[in-house]
Amino acid sequence: MVPEAGRRAIDPRSRANPAGVLLRMGAMSRRVVGAIRLLAGVGLLVTMAIQIADRVVNNVFDPWEYFSYFTIETSLMNIVVFVVGGVLALRRPSDTVLFTTIRMATLAYAIVTAGVYNLLLRDDSPSEGFQALGWPSEVMHVWMPLLIVLDWLVSPGRPALAWRRLGVVMIYPVAWLAYSLLRGAVSNGIYPYPFLDPATDGWGSVIAYIVGLSVGLLALAALAIAYSRRFAGDASLRQS
């Protein structure tokens, strides 16, 4: 029999026990992360609503065009991931493997979106006609990707991912690419981005961009998985 005093002394929840302090700190950190994720999800939703409203007011909103952009579709994913992630962080001590796999994919999408926009598309705005609000685009192409990366790097409760989950990152981009190329072929050359239009520099250029971006996505996903395995922090969260 362990004396009552002894049981209190080794109780991991005890305020005097370092492990208990760490558990409470971890729970508090998860709550902070949960609140930030929920705020980010709501903020991104409001940003998209304002962008759509701006287009509607100026009579330039085309739902088919708007919701065909990679940025818009992945932003919708990010809203869901932020909200679900916020709820998980508030209710669970760690994220699920399925949710973390989805986060890994959306992390790669966010970084590629930011890179493509800032390197290729930032100055590709019309000099005449409708001038869209600038800040919603900055939020979706700059600030949200930065927050998503930060969330991956520092948020507690992220399980390590198995390498076999690497291919998940390509499921959505392959489907989106097939849709975009088919849409361009049947809509008289309407492509969401100029680098996907074969009329610009030919199919060789299109294929080069596709291969390059695919390699980039896989590399980013591999880095995310490697980071999750290196810094899972808890052996119970690791996978083989």
Region annotations inferred by a language model:
Residues 61-69, 98-101, 126-139, 162-166, ...:
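Non-cytosolic membrane-interface motifs at loop->transmembrane helix junctions
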Residues 67-68, 187-223:
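Membrane-interface transmembrane-helix boundary segments in multi-pass integral membrane proteins
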Residues 24-40:
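N-terminal membrane topogenic signal
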Residues 110, 166-179:
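Hydrophobic alpha-helical membrane-insertion segments
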Residues 145-161:
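Alpha-helical transmembrane segments in multipass membrane proteins, preferentially the mid-helix core
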Residues 51-60, 118-128:
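Juxtamembrane "helix-exit" motif on the non-cytosolic side of transmembrane helices
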Residues 40-56:
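Alpha-helical transmembrane segments of multi-pass membrane proteins
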Residues 71-74, 134-146, 207-211:
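Membrane-interface loop-to-helix entry segments
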